[in-house]
Amino acid sequence: MLGSGLILVAILAYLSVMVLVFVWKQKFRGKLPPGPTPLPYIGNYLQLNTKDIYSSITELSERYGPVFTIYLGPRPVVVLYGYDAVKEALVDQAEEFSGRGEQATYNTLFKDYGVAFSSGERAKQLRRFSIATLRDFGVGKRGVEERIQEEAAYLIKMLRSTRGAPIDPNDYLSQTVSNVISSVVFGDAFDYEDKEFLELLHMMNEMNKFAASPVGQLYDMFHSVMKYLPGPQQQIIKNTKELEDFMIRKVKQNQSTLDLNSARNFIDSFLIHMHEEKKNPTSEFNIKNLVMTSLNLFFAGSETVSSTIRYGFLLLMKYPEVEAKVHEEIDRVIGRNRQPQFEDRMKMPYTEAVINEIQRFANLAPLGIPRKTIKNTTFRGFFLPKDTDVYPILGSLLTDPKFFTSPKHFNPQNFLDDRGQLKKIAAFVPFSVGKRFCLGDGLARMELFLFLTTILQNFRLKFPKKLEDIDASPKPLGFSRIIPRYTMSFLPI
């Protein structure tokens, strides 16, 4: 009895301290935007639908406007909803909002290192180098285009071997797309049966799913406690160590055969730059940043494109009249006697519009990647202290009725003008906007066009059930949306 009483007293004392700390912090938060009243320590957790955070935020924006504050646990997050608010922050005040916000799942691995999850001078140095080096290795140019064409040709060969039988396209696409970025980062591609490669893809996929899940959200809010408790987060923590160890091995392989006068891949280029910068005390070029930047590129270059293509298949089967028009444009512009080239897109406005609409409608990461203020900032009359987390809701731009007709419906005409030509839309920002837009956007655009057109040049898509049975709605999963698994057939043309 005495022991139980002491435990109860300890718990009550702990909660009391948390409440006092919470109240004390509110006095020093600056003049943050309004929002729902938070509870001590747990914040607004009980007011959010943890299975569909995006919908909860949309509802809150209708009540509090385009700029408001929610508390994820004890941590305040300023939410930017709609084109105007996001543009003002990420473009007009780009420097102030250029920091990377907190995401506990990914911070467990990256710990503020690497190009994607760092801030300040580190992020600037690594970003400049990464963009220049990716360009040197042909990203957005003919060099990487040829690698994509090679992988696309191998993918066609594998799909033909299925002989029209129903298959799950997920694994085929995931391995194919990942091998493109592998050739840039490592200098070569993996064998599709390589167990280490398959396990690597599995761990990255599990990490992304966990980060978006309700348990992942709890971990994001209360990671200081949950990292010591049993649960699925322990497997994720274990996986992060294995991912880091994998990349360390890759870096050591390159170090052992490095030629300072000839870079074979991204890792070599980074190692050479490390050598050149070794006497610079402010240099961010070190092994830790190399390992984490290489992992950043591998993450970014693997899952998003393959998921978008899988969702594209589902939509094209749901709307066969759209697939038919894409086939017609491919036949007219490219024909059947050569592989598609990226420059073909200039003569294929309808296909480009379809690809854009697939990305818009999928809206796979509606909350974007969190930002934070790198200095005390005034925004729309509110005072945001340095290191305030900010969520620019990119999904709110992709579904804005001011820019897209019937945004809840799939309609490639959103991206075509009255003459049937492709038009630019300011709110179409699937790769974010401003100083921290996705540095792999050029590669992703090239992959989406070449993989999709190459597949549709060779196959028609068939769903094994009736068209009305196709559920083409992305499934909300916490902070993101996922594509349901399904089977389909690729029928040779």
Swiss-Prot record:
Tissue expression per record = Liver.
Q: Which residues bind heme?
A: C438
The record's subcellular locations are:
Endoplasmic reticulum membrane; Microsome membrane
Molecular function via GO? arachidonate epoxygenase activity; heme binding; iron ion binding; oxidoreductase activity, acting on paired donors, with incorporation or reduction of molecular oxygen, reduced flavin or flavoprotein as one donor, and incorporation of one atom of oxygen
Supply the alphabetized keyword list. Endoplasmic reticulum, Heme, Iron, Membrane, Metal-binding, Microsome, Monooxygenase, Oxidoreductase
Enzyme's top EC category: oxidoreductase
For the biological process aspect of GO, one term held by this record is:
epoxygenase P450 pathway
State where it is primarily located.
Answer: endoplasmic reticulum
Any single GO CC term annotated in Swiss-Prot or TrEMBL for this entry:
endoplasmic reticulum membrane
Q: Which co-factors does it depend on? A: heme
Q: Which Gene3D superfamilies match?
A: Cytochrome P450 (1.10.630.10)
Catalytic reactions on record: an organic molecule + reduced [NADPH--hemoprotein reductase] + O2 = an alcohol + oxidized [NADPH--hemoprotein reductase] + H2O + H(+)
Q: What membrane topology does the UniProt entry give? A: Peripheral membrane protein
E.C. number: 1.14.14.1
As for family, the record states: Belongs to the cytochrome P450 family.
| Functional note | Cytochromes P450 are a group of heme-thiolate monooxygenases. In liver microsomes, this enzyme is involved in an NADPH-dependent electron transport pathway. It oxidizes a variety of structurally unrelated compounds, including steroids, fatty acids, and xenobiotics.
Protein name as it appears in the record: Cytochrome P450 2A9
Where does this protein come from, organism-wise? Mesocricetus auratus (Golden hamster)
